[in-house]
Every structure is written in structure tokens, then in C-alpha cells.
């Protein structure tokens, strides 16, 4: 193959990759504006497991919180989302500080605390009730037809209960729902590295 043919081949391959990336980027933004999708997100990296005994949901100092890496990770996720064309969003968060801090660090809009996004790790008997409340929250927000993407910051147990899959800290899940806010399908977007 001549040098010119190699350069043409490289150019064509690069152009195809650029087009595919642009389409994927447009697809995420378009999906989040179609009234059938939300972005579920697990909080960024918070070292440890669960919360310390006797924690108080109203006192961040008593909870498991974001570490330095988690704070950088949350900012990187916000940058990645802006790179996908999401510059402003409706953001809802669990009352746990590791979620609300992640939500704030995304820097995509104000954050509203919603109890259905709170962890039920300490009381698994709440799984069905909170999952139903999450579906109602999603339905209610999508019914408003604001066209702003909806981002829901929550925990491992909540995401697993809603869609049946485990995700890592900082991972995002594009979830398609029916008119009642119930899960249909999903695509996982791994957290970008800071």
C-alpha cells in the first residue's frame, strides 16, 4: 500500500470514529430529553462499606463520605456530561452526604433531596416500598416534560433493586422507563477517571 493510500485510509477511519462518537454523544442527550429516559448514578468514590454505627443522616461527619478521589471523580463526571452536551440538568439526590456532595460537584444545576433515593442498606425490608416511590418520582418528573435531563444520585442497593444490576461508584445508568416510571432497559456508562 502506498503512503498516500495509507494516509487516505487513516483519514477515513478517523472520520468514521468521529462520526460514531458524535452520534453516541447526541444519542445520550437526545435520550435524556425524550421523556422516556433518566440517568441513574451511584455516588462517587466513598472509601469504606456502609455507614458507621450510629450515623446521623443530618450530620455528614457521622457518615461515610467522599474521599479526595471521589471529589475529583465527581468533577470529572460533570465534565464528561458537559462534553456529552449536558450543561444543565434537573438533579435529585439521596439525603446521604456522599450523594448530595457528588450531585453538587457535578456542577450542572441545583440539587433537590428526595428520600426515595436514600439508601435502604440498613433496612432491606424497605426495598419494594422505596423502589415504588422511585418509580413514582420518575413518573412525576417526566410528566412535567421539562426537556431538561433528569439525573438521580443514589446508592448501590437502590440501583440494583430498580434495574437488577450492580454498578461501581460513580457509574451512570441511562434507564428507559415506561409511562409509570418502571424500568424497561438500560445502558451503563462507566465513570470517567479523574
Describe every region a protein language model picked out.
Residues 36-38, 146-154:
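Generic beta-sheet signal
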Residues 1-5:
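N-terminal secretory signal peptides that target proteins for export/translocation
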Residues 21-23:
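N-terminal signal peptide c-region/cleavage motif recognized by signal peptidases
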Residues 84-86, 141-148:
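Glycine-rich phosphate-binding loop signature in dinucleotide/nucleotide-binding domains
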Residues 133-143:
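A short, acidic, amphipathic alpha-helical segment used as a generic capping/interface helix at domain edges
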Residues 93-96, 153-157:
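Short, well-ordered beta-to-alpha junction loops that form the rim of enzyme active sites
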Residues 26-116, 120-124, 129, 165-194:
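Active-site-proximal alpha-helix that buttresses catalytic centers in soluble enzyme cores
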